[in-house]
Regions:
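Regulatory sensory and allosteric helical modules in signal-transduction proteins
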Residues: 26, 42-75
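Juxtadomain coupling helices with adjacent low-complexity linkers
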Residues: 106-136
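A short, aliphatic-rich beta-strand micro-motif
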Residues: 90-99
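GAF sensory/regulatory domain recognition
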Residues: 10, 22-44
């Protein structure tokens, strides 16, 4: 884990009142974990390297759009993998962060304690703030 990303993530989660989250950087053909906050060790281990299209982060990367769930533990869409259900949270979103050229450089994930659908304006605000993610 990279302390720059860990510090940024803690502050980012606090600004959006989220209880857990992660930063995954694009590393060739997979996403590599760079920071995690309040994720169980088994979730960190399972998400060290995420292939394109797998789980919420992999889908956000593949489709270049935020992927959300109202409830991590009860999601049946297939986007939430079994390991992620161990996260102590309900509503969650994974969203792409792009570099200046528009290429996805990272996926940021956030989870909240309450069950809800995130409105478009809240996702837009989170997306705007995620652009402050430090460069690798």
């Amino acid at each position: 884990m990279d302390e720059r990303f860990t510090t940024w993530l803690r502050d980012f989660l606090s600004r959006h009142r989220a209880v857990a989250g992660s930063v995954h950087l694009v590393d060739g053909d997979h996403l590599a974990i760079a920071a995690a906050h309040n994720l169980p060790p088994q979730v960190i281990e399972l998400t060290r390297a995420i292939p394109l299209g797998k789980g919420m982060a992999g889908l956000a990367w593949q489709h270049d759009k935020p992927i959300q769930t109202c409830n991590l533990k009860e999601d049946t869409s297939g986007a939430v993998k079994p390991g992620a259900k161990a996260v102590d949270g309900k509503a969650a979103v994974a969203l792409p962060v792009k570099d200046a050229s528009g290429t996805i450089r990272a996926i940021v994930g956030l989870a909240w304690m309450d069950e809800r659908e995130l409105p478009a304006d809240e996702i837009a605000a989170i997306d705007q703030d995620a652009r402050s993610l430090p460069e690798a």
